[in-house]
């Protein structure tokens, strides 16, 4: 029997040292029979004689130029006159797919001003204006038309003295309401109008987007998935370590560990960035590496799964000039690094030369120990941070956008003898229908089993609501 632990990390953006930080908090947490996957693409590319930004840039030689040596311009592949920038990435299920449980969209860029130029050895602004970057356009395979998306600001360096030359920003939007009811999830996703600095700026301009998708998979084992986001600069003076807990590796047999992530400003020919794993139970540390990603040049402008470059994108540049997206298995032969019964895992992000910003990281654990598997069985548990409702464990019997569907489910539960109530979450723009709120998880589980036995509701589940200031 094999087990799987997956750690997801989205990281990004060139920056000066000792930058301002945004504390990392849980964005999403769930127990689910399913998987997590990330897709994305860069949104600016080089423009040079004989090549437009829409043409893939494939130079991965030791002499390949860095993004601060190019005239960087917007990619725009959608043939839509209403967009100034757009790129696509393809999503497909790993194994048998199912309903999307969560989808989160991130976009980020270096953006001190609209455009700049290199004169001699000095970067000069050409257009000092800086447009609003909080909204983008988003197209899914199901809708095939752009939907405007407004984001939640995670970080903006425009007013930070240490960061203003690059002025990186990061935005996030929960797009679950667009993917969860979709009849077509597999296909190309397009993000348009991500703002970034054009031309040449200090350190080079980079920009991209990433879509995190958590989906149900009936053939999967129960997994715990947690995502965190925030902002922290990684420099030669400032490293970052995340201690993941709340899991326990199997008591016996082999299991696998995997990480995924996204970065900005990981230049191909600038060495010194490294990601390593430390396991307290074994006392061992190992650096991550693959044929695509050397241990001491981990962020190198590529999009990969293990040893293979991913090309299901438009454009499908082999050198993405400062944008990285990766998925890698962790070598753990004979449980040398991560032993059985391990309960914590540290991810270490370091840099010896250049700098980047970390803004999201996540953990997925598949095939939990017997006691956890038995406890949660097929019951989905989703954690939500909210200030507008009482914290506790809510037994959910339906989630809908349409008020007619809400009323129908409430009436349906009434016919079964339950007084269903509705909690409207403004952040997700969703109506959660629940039949009880409990202080203890065990009491909520009992109610779930009762609903299963006494109604025809297909999948009651638990919403774990926490209140954070």
Q: Where are the model-predicted features located?
A:
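Bacterial Sec-dependent N-terminal signal peptides
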Residues: 1-22
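Extended, compositionally biased intrinsically disordered regions at domain boundaries
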Residues: 376-380
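Extracytoplasmic
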Residues: 381-391, 401-469
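Local beta-strand/beta-hairpin segments that build beta-sheet-rich folds
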Residues: 288, 397-398, 435
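Aromatic/hydrophobic beta-strand junction motif of beta-rich domains
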Residues: 259-263, 384, 397
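Disulfide-rich extracellular domains of secreted proteins
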Residues: 20-375
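Boundary/activation segment at the start of structured domains
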Residues: 28, 393-394
